Amino acid sequence: MSVTAAQGFTASGIAAGIKENGNPDLALVVNNGPRLAAAGVFTSNRVKAAPVLWSEQVLKGGVVSAVVLNSGGANACTGPKGFQDTHATAEKVAETLDLNAGEVAVASTGLIGVLLPMDKLLPGVERAVAGLSEHGGEKAAIAIKTTDTVHKTSVVTKDGWTVGGMAKGAGMLAPGLATMLVVLTTDADLDRDALDRALRAATRTTFDRVDSDGCMSTNDTVLLLASGASEVTPKQEEFAEAVRAVCDDLGQQLIQDAEGASKDIKVEVVGAATEDDAVEVGRSIARNNLLKCAIHGEDPNWGRVLSAIGTTRAAFEPDQLNVAINGVWVCKKGGVGEDRDLVDMRYREVHIVADLAAGTETATIWTNDLTADYVHENSAYSS
């Protein structure tokens, strides 16, 4: 049920004609209350798409009555006209639903540098409104796909309240956040500050640690909407954990559907002096293309792990580093460890542990291997 699992929400997904292949490309999520609150996290890319700039302003009000999302065009790097189109989209949603346009968030995903076909999008909004349903979450999740092969949803149900969510993303997955659009909903009765604390804590250890290809999008948007319909106010810790669980599940689905990937790689850094050190090392390993190619070839090349660690500013002694691949400590104290032939890499999941032997802090980054399919898909993306 995705975003409609929580009480107080309706959603829809339709084909407005934005995509040339005729697939669904316009989603709408509406918060029917009774007590609305919202929080959001956006890309840290300095080049921000028009819908990101618009939605950042909307979130300052702390209330989001509706979110309209299109796939098939990012509306990024489109100048003043692109922002005008975003404004017009919000106005159309507001007019059709009798809302305030300043409470309508907008999100877009697709090719950068191309204006959206507003002659198709605006009539599509009317059809999306007509299709709103308490069971429309799956259709909405399908409509935001781009190169995704599957739609991504998640739900956590607690004692009298629920957190649900949908996500899209398959390429340009990198910290800050990852080419992804995410809408989370809850019927818990919470204010914007409680939502903001929970969302930022969740994204820090989930979406921000998904690093499929090291490319940061212009459009990343994660929204958390509360309706208050359950009339239950959970403890902050319990709510934050539910949001984290949904984000973690969606993040894993993003990695599993990464473009062209044949291996899902969990990079776990342990024994770091600080968490920042652990994250920096994890990112360096996850972004090492030589290592990603080796993993694709089922080669447990621990030397490339050490090489990646060595490019960081983290505290460690080279002769104290240890590396395990799928449970085999192939590197011990900076040199040869157990027999690398013992490493079984036949399966999709690959687990790398890098022990810095410099402290007690840890961090985990998720990435993928680098394949010919990834290169092919992205070399032909705009053609």
From Swiss-Prot:
- Annotated site location: Cleavage: 178-179
Where it mainly occurs, coarsely classed, is cytoplasm
Report the pathway entry. Amino-acid biosynthesis; L-arginine biosynthesis; L-ornithine and N-acetyl-L-glutamate from L-glutamate and N(2)-acetyl-L-ornithine (cyclic): step 1/1; Amino-acid biosynthesis; L-arginine biosynthesis; N(2)-acetyl-L-ornithine from L-glutamate: step 1/4
State the Gene Ontology BP annotations.
L-arginine biosynthetic process; ornithine biosynthetic process
Q: Which residues bind substrate?
A: 146, 168, 179, 259, 378, 383
Q: Which UniProt keywords apply?
A: Acyltransferase, Amino-acid biosynthesis, Arginine biosynthesis, Autocatalytic cleavage, Cytoplasm, Multifunctional enzyme, Transferase
Q: Which family does it belong to?
A: Belongs to the ArgJ family.
Q: What is the role of the protein in this entry?
A: Catalyzes two activities which are involved in the cyclic version of arginine biosynthesis: the synthesis of N-acetylglutamate from glutamate and acetyl-CoA as the acetyl donor, and of ornithine by transacetylation between N(2)-acetylornithine and glutamate.
Its protein name is: Arginine biosynthesis bifunctional protein ArgJ
Q: Which organism is it from?
A: Streptomyces avermitilis (strain ATCC 31267 / DSM 46492 / JCM 5070 / NBRC 14893 / NCIMB 12804 / NRRL 8165 / MA-4680)
